[in-house]
Curated annotation (Swiss-Prot):
Protein name: 2-keto-3-deoxy-L-rhamnonate aldolase
Role: Catalyzes the reversible retro-aldol cleavage of 2-keto-3-deoxy-L-rhamnonate (KDR) to pyruvate and lactaldehyde.
Native organism: Salmonella paratyphi A (strain AKU_12601)
Chain residues that bind Mg(2+): 153, 179
Name of the gene this protein is made from: rhmA
Binding residues annotated for substrate, in chain numbering: 151, 178-179
CC cofactor note: Binds 1 Mg(2+) ion per subunit.
Protein keywords: Lyase, Magnesium, Metal-binding
Positions annotated as active site in the UniProt record: 49 (proton acceptor)
């Protein structure tokens, strides 16, 4: 099969396009397909905080595949074995959480690339990603089309940000606001002025290094701020949060109850 692998999400990052995404935490292919029909540029399938198995991730990739929205998978960690599984089921873009050092970033790069560029295990003949061995020159194409994003979400990671940005093979850096604010001493308060100052500075440093900058903002005003600061792949909501807010708001229209969604909410 003379198919050529492409990764529109990665191509958009290279061009500097602004790409708007949505976080998927519901773990179901049904919800993933509903989100894919909405027209978001990218959909983050969360395997870190949502109870997704590898098979769950697989089914959601299948559900999204017919649509223009591009899937991004966040595994629970950046282990070589887990990365191998997730890539084999067809993920082309990964977001790796809790990357604190340049050495960690290099290890992740190696885990996502086939030899001689890395240490990804070879098994294309049994992998959905290679159409079960039917894509010619798959290993070279996979190395080229892979998009790797890492999360900076701790005080240690901030101290090592410049070194992380120098690692070849990293396409973008995603700022994790919840963990970052907690690490800085402001738990559940990503809106604190000091945290905001640091986020803005990080986005500037990431873009200045020629990398894409990403963020998750469930508050529309914060999302607009990040876009204005230069972030070019921004998730503007979480499916489970949007669902609970809609349910609560609909209920309060008909019953004298306090809507949960009126309380301050953060990811």
């Amino acid at each position: 099969m003379n198919a050529l692998l492409s990764n529109p999400f990665k191509e958009g990052l290279r061009k500097g396009d602004t790409q708007i995404g949505l976080w998927l935490s519901s773990t179901t292919s049904y919800m993933a397909e509903i989100a894919a029909t909405s027209g978001y540029d990218w959909l983050l399938i969360d395997g870190e905080h949502a109870p997704n198995t590898v098979q769950d991730l697989y089914h959601q990739l299948q559900a999204i595949a017919p649509y223009a929205s591009q899937p991004v998978i966040r595994p629970i960690e950046g282990s070589k074995a887990l990365i191998k599984q997730v890539l084999d089921i067809g993920a082309q873009t990964l977001l790796i959480p809790m990357v604190d050092t340049a050495e960690q970033a290099r290890q992740v790069v190696s885990a996502t690339r086939y030899p001689p560029l890395g240490q990804r295990g070879v098994g294309a003949s049994v992998a959905r990603a290679a159409r079960w061995g039917r894509i010619d020159n798959y290993m070279a194409q996979a190395n080229e089309s892979l998009c790797l994003l890492v999360q900076v979400e701790s005080k240690v990671a901030l101290e090592n940000l410049d070194a992380i940005l120098e690692v070849e093979g990293i396409d973008g850096v995603f700022i994790g606001p919840a963990d970052l604010s907690a690490s800085l001493g402001y738990p559940d308060n990503a809106g604190h002025p000091e945290v905001q100052r640091i986020i803005e500075a990080c986005i500037y440093r990431i873009r200045a290094a020629g990398k894409a900058a990403g963020f998750l903002a469930v508050d529309p005003a914060m999302a607009q701020k990040c876009l204005a600061w230069g972030a070019n792949f921004v998730a503007v909501g979480v499916d489970t949060m949007l669902y609970t807010e809609a349910l609560d708001n609909r209920l309060v229209m008909f019953k004298s109850v306090q809507s949960v969604s009126t309380a301050k909410r953060s990811y």
